[in-house]
Amino acid sequence: MAIVGVLVGVLGGAAIGGLAAARATRQCRKPSDRAGQAVLHRMNASHAGVTAWGLGHVEIGTDFTILDVGCGGGQTIDRLTSMAPNGKVFGIDYSEESVVVASETNKHWIASGRVQVQLGTVSQLPFPDATFDLVTAVETHYYWPNLPADVREVMRVLRPGGTFLIVAETYRGRRNDWMYRPTMQFVLKAAYLTPDQHRALLVDAGYEDVKVFVDESRGWICARGSRSG
């Protein structure tokens, strides 16, 4: 599981506890300084598999305008830009270090005018209503400050008929859940949801055609919903 791997990398093999746990939690939730850069590059590599799997559950038009929320090191932005060759991709993150690393990862796309990366928060997205055909959230919704309200804020910036896709590498109730739950709930203090809770999250926010997919062997999940229209 990549989250645990990132934690071990941050801690340098130390036991997760006390100040070490606090430092690891801080870097996973909001990377900063040199340690944060290392975490972001690690995430770019470790999240590649689950990202490819998750994006396989959504249709992406060649001219889509796309937002990646919590863009981290920017690898998802790069993948999305390749999948929408006539479109444009925006990335936001509330970590300044993430914006720097994601911009470096996508500097060739930025230079061509096809990618824009900026500082921002999911709770108050810096975009007009009905801007995007697709909004993605890869390995990030765990940490959103007010998950139900933030999911509704995502809907605001979706165009009618647009799609919101959550992709995550773990979920509550997965195989060997006992190995991951302490890290997710007590170390990272993350929103650790079951598949049914992912479904309810989107349905309660007003999304339509909600689907939840799991890869039980790897413990991966993605949840997809559309704005009416």
Residue ranges and their predicted role:
Residues 23, 30-44, 163-224:
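C-terminal alpha-helical "lid/dimerization" subdomain adjacent to the S-adenosyl-L-methionine
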Residues 123-135:
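A short acidic, Gly/Pro-enriched loop at the edge of an enzyme's catalytic core
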Residues 67-124:
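Class I SAM-dependent methyltransferase SAM/SAH-binding core
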Residues 2-35:
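N-terminal, positively charged/glycine-rich alpha-helical extensions of SAM-dependent methyltransferases
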Residues 86, 158-164:
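Short glycine-dipeptide loop
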Residues 148-160:
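A short glycine-rich, Lys/Arg-flanked "PGG" loop and its adjoining helix->strand segment in the class I
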Residues 45-64:
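Conserved alpha-helix/loop element of class I SAM-dependent methyltransferases that forms part
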Residues 134-147:
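A short SAM/SAH-binding and catalytic strip from SAM-dependent methyltransferases
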